[in-house]
């Protein structure tokens, strides 16, 4: 089942012609959800060149090809579903309201026939040359091996830009869309309505933005304005965020954008348990999240495509030390709480991203993300992206991108990380703030220590300021209690900053940069992505980054104090698996 959402708001450019593309690629059926995003009733009528089934609360009907139909979307009725027949490729509709009684054209087009380029990207399926594992070093074998985890083939990496500083991380996204960076004064003033000069902006065919959060704050508004510019020029935009973390103003900003420009397609991810599912699965509906981080811009001009991956979300906490004053902008979020379980929380996070400009790699990562975008809507299953093919020649690429959906791929990411840790011979260097290891990852740590592999961890044991910070701190202390006398654990101690980077380096030649936390959530609950690089030269570039984290940290005392209530709570495996 392919499911896409068309957001309708009578106040969103009410007289402008609009086009919405839907995809039935490799799907047995298609559902187009018409979602009311405004405060005015909407009337829709027209014809399609194929049979169309319509389902609304309390009623349903089927319309023959070329037969006119009419439906209304009241304010109180949040959605109506359209089910186009496989032969249907086009609908010519008019959308009217009290604001535009004459109506405005709305065209629905099937992507497979209307846009061969995006269809080719979305249907890409790569053959990966895999060298004979006989005689290979174990780390190399693990890197090139095929597994159930969704991975690209080994790719060229070029010379990626390493984005350690927060402004550099945000400006990389800005430059990919605007063609130039924002000056320091723009961040100092923190005005989300600042003038933006689009004279150097690239001409883009596709924008992918995948993030845990897309907040209505300075960062989110600037990104929304950049995307809006390209949407007005006809660029196809695909945005993926987590529904359970979006607040009212976040939703309003994104829904308004998608309503004004239907070429901006929005997926708000929410995992739903089966009817009658056990209690723990019902509860996990509240905290399973889409944690894949990527901005990919595919440009028409050579050399201007970019992809950025890592740990940062679209949230001011990744850019500013403290909340900026947005009271002049009532439609933006003014943050308040700095601890607990409130969605109004604010932390200042130290994170790490990587920007890649190699055009083949950018396109490959965008195509890989399409497997998530076009996942089966009912099961969350995604099609494979690559297939291994035995090769005598050594692959030229040094980097592989992965995407994990642990509750659908049999915890394949956990198995991959276990393999990587098991292959370590000398040293493992880790930067990660969340240290609630799964049992299998813990056994891999124990095995590495038994082999006398040196493990160094730069973490953030005290996670006060993060959402649920007190619980996360207790879990980190349990890690220190277990491993403090065997692992060199250091606490990142930049003042009032919460570590958020996720880096793992093995034997001075393999580097993983990802969204993956070393906790149960990442391996059991959340979708994740990252890049694994097997290249000593790239490790040499990353080593100063790691040393900078070490320089901003101090050794952790092993005599931690953990309250009895937390010990009792986390003695239950089900509770630990939730964090």
Residue ranges with predicted function:
Residues 2-46, 50, 69-71:
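Extracellular ectodomain segments of secreted/surface proteins
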Residues 48-54, 58-60:
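Short, solvent-exposed loop/linker segments at beta-strand-coil boundaries, enriched for Pro/Gly
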Residues 80, 89-97:
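A short beta-strand micro-motif common to beta-rich folds, especially ectodomain repeats
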Residues 414-427, 442-450:
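Acidic, glycine-rich loop-and-beta core segments that form the ion-binding/anion-interacting portion
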């Amino acid at each position: 089942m392919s499911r896409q959402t068309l957001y309708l708001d009578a106040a969103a450019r009410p007289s402008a012609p609009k086009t919405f593309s839907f995809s039935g690629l490799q799907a047995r059926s298609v559902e187009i959800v018409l979602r009311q995003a405004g405060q005015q009733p909407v009337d829709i009528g027209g014809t399609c060149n194929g049979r169309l089934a319509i389902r609304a609360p309390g009623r349903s009907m089927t319309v023959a090809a070329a037969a006119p139909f009419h439906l209304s979307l009241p304010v109180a009725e949040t959605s109506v579903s359209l089910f186009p027949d496989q032969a249907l490729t086009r609908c010519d509709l008019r959308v009217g309201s009290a604001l535009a009684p004459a109506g405005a054209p709305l065209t629905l087009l099937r992507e497979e026939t209307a846009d061969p380029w995006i269809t080719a990207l979305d249907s890409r399926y790569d053959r990966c040359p895999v060298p004979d594992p006989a005689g290979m070093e174990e780390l190399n074998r693990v890197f090139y091996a095929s597994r159930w985890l969704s991975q690209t083939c080994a790719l060229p990496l070029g010379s990626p830009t390493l984005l350690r500083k927060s402004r550099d991380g945000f400006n990389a996204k800005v430059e990919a869309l605007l063609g130039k960076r924002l000056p320091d004064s723009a961040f100092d003033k923190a005005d989300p309505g600042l003038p933006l000069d689009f004279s150097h902006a690239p001409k883009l065919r596709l924008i992918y933005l995948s993030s845990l959060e897309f907040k209505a704050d300075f960062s989110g508004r600037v990104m929304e304005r950049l995307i809006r510019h390209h949407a007005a020029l006809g660029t196809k935009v695909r945005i993926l965020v987590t529904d359970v973390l979006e607040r009212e103003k976040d939703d309003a900003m994104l829904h308004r954008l998608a309503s004004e420009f239907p070429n901006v397609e929005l997926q708000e991810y929410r995992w739903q348990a089966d009817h009658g599912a056990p209690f723990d699965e019902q509860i996990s509906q509240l905290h399973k999240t889409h944690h894949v981080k990527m901005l990919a811009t595919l440009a028409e001009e050579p050399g201007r495509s970019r992809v950025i991956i890592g740990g940062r979300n679209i949230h001011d906490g990744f850019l500013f030390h403290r909340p900026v004053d947005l009271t002049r902008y009532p439609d933006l979020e003014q943050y308040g709480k700095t601890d607990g379980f409130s969605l109004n929380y604010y932390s200042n996070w130290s994170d790490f991203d990587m920007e890649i400009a190699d055009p083949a790699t950018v396109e490959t990562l965008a195509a890989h993300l399409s497997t998530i975008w076009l996942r089966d809507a009912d099961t969350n299953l995604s099609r494979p992206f690559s297939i291994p093919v035995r090769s005598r020649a050594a692959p030229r690429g040094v980097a592989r991108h992965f995407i994990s959906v642990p509750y659908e791929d049999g915890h394949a990411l956990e198995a991959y990380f276990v393999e990587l840790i098991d292959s370590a011979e000398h040293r493992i260097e880790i930067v990660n703030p969340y240290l609630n290891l799964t049992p299998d990852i813990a056994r891999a740590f124990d095995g590495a220590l038994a082999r006398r592999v040196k493990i160094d961890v730069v973490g953030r044991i005290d996670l006060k300021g993060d959402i649920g910070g007190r619980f996360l701190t207790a879990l980190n202390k349990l890690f220190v209690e277990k491993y403090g006398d065997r692992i060199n654990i250091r606490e990142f101690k930049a003042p009032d900053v919460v570590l958020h980077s996720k880096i793992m380096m093995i034997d001075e030649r393999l580097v993983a940069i990802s969204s993956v936390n070393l906790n149960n959530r990442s391996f059991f609950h959340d979708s994740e992505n990252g890049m694994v690089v097997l290249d000593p030269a790239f490790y040499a570039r990353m080593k100063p980054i790691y040393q900078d984290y070490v320089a901003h940290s101090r050794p952790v005392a092993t005599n931690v104090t953990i309250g009895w209530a937390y010990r009792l709570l986390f003695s239950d495996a089900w509770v630990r698996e939730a964090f």
